[in-house]
């Protein structure tokens, strides 16, 4: 059920270069109509599941974070650049949402180089400073590496344990990271789709930041919002 079925049978745009030639159907034929009907039915099922999921989320209670602390101010004041008005407004709105007693679901949009990472960093700091864990989900290992080192540098003056979970880590390192997430030893983790694996267990996850959310698809990201 759900998005997987849609992908298996949905009508797709043909892209050349595939090893197998596409099967041709007559537009007026019964087989083409059946294919479209299956795709529509699968989409309807997935849409219902998604609506049920969002309704369930609305009934969930979330953790209400405390107001900004002196430590939060120190972290934000350590930013070496002048913030833009949009950065300041977005960061404040996100932090105010985190202080409400229900799960936050926010979309932050901005062009490359406009400071989205710093806005996310301030939310991540607010989370881990209160003893919760935070995760940053990214679509590629290159982005994971980039965000990991950026956040390591940004948090270097504060006593938080930051790790990265991707193919850049050996099997032994990944095992230790998984153990650290479950025990609470790791405060902040940056990872690829591995973070969506069923074997991942957090001791006290308080915030999930998804970079380039559109590259993960609706279904996996929507279900992670329940964590």
Annotated model-derived regions:
Residues 25-114, 118-129, 133-135:
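Pre-Walker A segment
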Residues 133-150:
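Conserved Walker A/P-loop ATP-binding site and its immediately adjacent core
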Residues 145-170:
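Conserved helix-turn-beta segment of the N-terminal RecA-like "Helicase ATP-binding" lobe
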Residues 201-226:
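SF2 helicase catalytic motif II
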Residues 164-174, 192-195:
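Conserved helicase motor
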Residues 2-10, 224-227:
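Conserved small/polar residues in nucleotide/adenosyl-binding loops
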Residues 171-188:
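Conserved motor-coupling elements within RecA-like helicase/translocase cores
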